[in-house]
């Protein structure tokens, strides 16, 4: 399954890790650990924020990813299952059966 992990770093802590040089180390380690399809960084609501896209079948994903971001960045974290076009197509192909069985 594919997931989008969104995070926002509190301003004060973000300033601290940028000044100390830790931010580069943390993001490099996240990339090594999570092996994401993509990582994007941007300002959102006045905070340093980002989105990480990963594939995982691990039921412990929320804990594993959340703890890295909470401990490493003091971040607010949101984890959302997402689909690409192929995933959506597979789901839609099953839609007829679901409608037939549950309507």
Range-by-range predicted roles:
Residues 1-103:
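Conserved, structured core segments of small domains
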């Amino acid at each position: 399954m594919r997931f989008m992990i969104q995070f926002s770093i509190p301003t004060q802590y973000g300033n601290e890790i940028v000044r100390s040089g830790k931010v580069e180390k943390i993001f490099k380690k996240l990339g090594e650990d999570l092996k994401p399809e993509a990582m994007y960084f941007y300002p959102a609501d006045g905070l340093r924020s980002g989105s990480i896209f990963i594939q995982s079948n691990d039921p412990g994903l929320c804990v594993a990813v959340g703890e890295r971001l909470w401990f490493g960045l003091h971040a607010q974290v949101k984890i959302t299952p997402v689909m690409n076009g192929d995933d959506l197509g597979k789901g839609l192909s099953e839609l007829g059966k679901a409608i037939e069985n549950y309507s």
